[in-house]
A protein has these predicted regions:
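Phosphate/NTP-binding elements of NTP-utilizing enzymes
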Residues: 2-4, 9-18, 26-237
Length: 237
């Protein structure tokens, strides 16, 4: 692709973005939700299955949560409009996310929003994924959404009432990196090595070369009132 074609492609995407009240741009909701999960039974080889599991995980937080992260207690109601946990996932599958969400206790609110959602945002959407989504017919605008919502180098701050509770949330995230074999199989490039910081209060997944110099973790945990000077995050939960 020539430089002129690349520039035209960028201009085409920018024209289709919506503009918020403060001038920020975001991918339209219709594009974000305009995906179709790929049936695994269409795959003929283990490599194809792995690619499809990855692709479905990028597209759908509920899929990642139930199929990859093993959240078997989430609602399995096939009527998506009545499936509570599917709808909870859809709530945060949007560009320009700034939501305050109130849900009664014991409905897996922390599981969806403080465990599954942060990991979903930290999935590694790169050139290989871009090429795959293009090859199966997704638009440049949908790929823009994927690039905006997933980043191997993302910095997420998780806040709880106390640091003790925040660390408990962190332990649930770290458990997937340390003990979820299926998650490890699908996304080996983000699994931490001995070089990455991995403590109770800061979890650094393996990053790209350009992201390794960041002081903030992929997932940093704090309690209310903790100092945040000189810290910079992409997402706060």
């Amino acid at each position: 692709m020539s430089q002129r074609e690349i520039e035209q492609k960028v201009r085409d995407v920018l024209r289709t973005l919506e503009v918020g009240e403060t001038g920020d741009t975001f991918v339209p909701r219709s594009t974000v939700l305009g995906y179709n999960l790929i049936p695994i039974d269409l795959c003929k080889t283990p490599a194809e299955k792995k690619q499809v599991y990855r692709a479905n995980s990028f597209m759908d937080l509920y899929y990642l949560s139930t199929v990859v992260m093993g959240k078997s207690r989430f609602s399995k109601n096939p009527d998506k409009a009545s499936n509570l946990h599917y709808q909870m996932c859809l709530t945060v599958m949007k560009d320009g996310l700034k939501e305050g969400i109130e849900i009664p206790r014991d409905h897996f609110k922390s599981t969806v929003y403080s465990e599954c959602f942060p990991i979903w945002r930290a999935l590694p959407f790169g050139k290989r994924e871009e090429d795959f989504f293009t090859s199966v017919g997704y638009s440049d605008l949908y790929i823009e959404w994927m690039q905006r919502t997933h980043s191997q180098d993302i910095r997420i701050l998780l806040v709880s009432e106390t640091i003790t509770n925040a660390i408990k949330l962190g332990s649930r995230i770290s458990n997937h990196y340390e003990n979820n074999a299926f998650f490890n199989h699908l996304f080996p490039e983000i699994m931490p090595t001995s070089k990455e910081t991995w403590t109770n209060e800061s979890l650094h997944q393996r990053r790209t070369a350009s992201g390794r110099g960041q002081g903030e973790g992929t997932f940093d945990l704090i309690g209310v009132g903790a100092a945040l000077q000189s810290r910079h995050y992409n997402v706060v939960v």
